[in-house]
Swiss-Prot record:
The keyword 4Fe-4S does not apply. InterPro entries: BioY. GO terms for molecular function: biotin transmembrane transporter activity. Keywords: Cell membrane, Membrane, Transmembrane, Transmembrane helix, Transport. GO terms for cellular component: plasma membrane. It comes from Treponema pallidum (strain Nichols). This is Probable biotin transporter BioY. Probable biotin transporter. It is found in: Cell membrane. Its main location: membrane.
Amino acid sequence: MHRTEPTINCVHDGTRSLHLSIDTTRALPAHSGNEPTRTHLAAVRVSLLKTIPVAPPKILKDSSFRVTLRIDPSEEYCTMHRSKSLAFVALFAALISSSALVSIPLKPVPLVLQNAAAVLTGLLLGPRDGALAVLSFLGAGLLGLPVFSGGRGGYTALFAPTGGFLLGYILAATLAGAIAQHHRLSCTPPRGGGRALLLWIRLTVATLVGFLSIYSIGLPVLGYVLGLRTGELMLGVFLPFFLADTLKIALVVLLAHHLAPTVRRHLYRHG
């Protein structure tokens, strides 16, 4: 039994609907005398954007049929300008470094803005470029530049009690960028009340996870270096500092929401 691929004709009527006229004549058996075979359409690839699943149509007597697909406008296709991406990595690495100027010396760890800058970097640049920006910032500090809190620099900062928090910035940018679904955040502006609310929720969860991931590395290292127990870490470090971080979380969410269109306009091209 010889079968060939069906012919697919696409017609766009200017709305969100894409009409596919699919001729299955050539997909039928070569011999005659039988009713046309039922054709199962598993999926249709549209403009190389994504594979859109379609329910198998029931064809018993007709050799052609018409399918209407509703295109979701949130699935907008865009690609990244790689040269601009590297420029943004350098820009946000400088942002994280400059945020070291805002530091309140407290014990056992200072109150800083660098954790907020690291999470914001992940939200806007995504997990890969966000982590790359943090690594660039850490590399500058390891070379001796005074980019760590309090104007510190050098490899000894990583072996200090707060060294775990610096390493946690990498995880924070990665997780925040991944949870925020960076590609959709950067490529697709929110449309409609439901989607706008979903964007706020996604940004809030991503930011919260980013901050908590910094503590997940920083607290164990701090406890190991200073010999503090878990209870002492939770009551003396985590609770008071995380209460202050709630204000930074709100600030990061607001900044990410308002800066995402700028990133989308400069960093991505559509088509």
